[in-house]
């Protein structure tokens, strides 16, 4: 989006009378939208603007999810304004507060990093659920999971068979989940988590599906041993574990087909793991999950 687009003036005027945009730059990532760090010459000052792409109708869903996430005890962007009618840029846009910090996808103090992620997940999963409806109650992963398309190698076939066999026995206990909780969406400042961003996929789902999703990202970055330490740290905090984690770990088999996108996102954040090694890490995580299920 060009800085000269008249939509920026309309946005600024919506946020504060006679306000002007004095500075802006596009942020790394953004997922299904283009995200910008924008500075105004008056309050609210520095904000993040997310402009959704043509044909993307998820802006109202994300706005609802972000507003619900305000009850989370960890720092979350504050919703400021929404243009769901596409009057600013010809596309839907939402404005939120900017949090301090940046992602850490190559931690030096791994033990502290893992412990902080586990505590953040636990804190998130303790969020009160009263009033959750609409976008937050869409079908959980256990109801929407499908095996990856195309021909499967032997490891993928075993994983798919194991998931298919265990799906009917998965519990229906739901907590509030971020939906995309991974290191690239966790901000750090001075060695501590300073916020969690991108609540576009937030919904009610099981804690084990979210933990498995995060483990998958950690495994891709740092290997299965570190991913296992995250599971241990989380289970130590909540006081129990479940074989369902292994089932959800196996559901992540499809992530191998999107590893190139994950690799590019990590590269933009300043970390460039060995792509083939990262794929081998994901395969090893699948083998460990199959072993835990005696499959």
Spans of model-derived segments:
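Active-site Asp-x-Gly
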Residues: 174-176, 187-235, 242
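Helix-rich C-terminal or lid/interface subdomains of diverse kinases
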Residues: 56, 213-295
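ATP-binding pocket architecture of kinase catalytic cores
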Residues: 25-135
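An alpha-helical support segment within catalytic cores of ATP-dependent transferases
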Residues: 3-18, 87, 123-179, 236, ...
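Conserved N-terminal boundary motif of the eukaryotic protein kinase catalytic domain
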Residues: 17-25
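Conserved catalytic motifs of the protein kinase core domain
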Residues: 44, 91, 172-174, 192
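Short, surface-exposed alpha-helical segments at coil->helix boundaries
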Residues: 5-9, 63, 224-228
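Short beta-strand segments
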Residues: 48-51, 80-81, 176-178, 197, ...
């Amino acid at each position: 989006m060009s800085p000269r687009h008249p939509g920026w003036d309309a946005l600024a005027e919506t946020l504060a009378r006679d306000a002007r945009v004095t500075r802006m730059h596009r942020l790394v990532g953004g997922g299904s939208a283009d995200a910008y760090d924008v500075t105004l010459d008056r309050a609210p000052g520095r904000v993040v603007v997310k402009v959704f792409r043509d044909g993307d109708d998820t802006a109202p869903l994300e706005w609802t999810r972000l507003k619900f996430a305000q009850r989370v005890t960890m720092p979350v962007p504050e919703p400021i304004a929404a243009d769901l009618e596409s009057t600013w840029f010809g596309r839907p846009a939402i404005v939120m507060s900017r949090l301090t910090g940046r992602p850490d996808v190559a931690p030096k103090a791994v033990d502290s990093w893992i412990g902080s992620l586990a505590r953040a997940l636990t804190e998130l999963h303790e969020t009160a659920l009263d009033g959750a409806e609409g976008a937050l109650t869409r079908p959980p992963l256990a109801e929407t999971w499908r095996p990856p398309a195309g021909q499967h190698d032997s490891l993928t076939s075993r994983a798919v068979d194991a998931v298919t066999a265990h799906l009917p026995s998965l519990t229906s206990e739901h907590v509030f989940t971020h939906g995309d909780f991974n290191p690239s969406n966790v901000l750090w400042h001075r060695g501590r988590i300073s916020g969690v961003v991108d609540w576009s996929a937030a919904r009610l789902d099981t804690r084990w599906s979210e933990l498995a999703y995060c483990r998958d990202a950690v495994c891709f970055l740092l290997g299965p041993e570190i991913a296992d330490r995250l599971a241990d740290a989380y289970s130590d905090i909540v006081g129990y574990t479940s074989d369902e984690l292994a089932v959800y770990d196996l559901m992540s088999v499809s992530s191998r087909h999107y590893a190139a996108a994950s690799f590019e996102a990590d590269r933009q954040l300043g970390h460039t793991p060995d792509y083939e090694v990262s794929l081998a890490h994901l395969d090893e995580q699948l083998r460990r999950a199959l072993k835990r299920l005696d499959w």
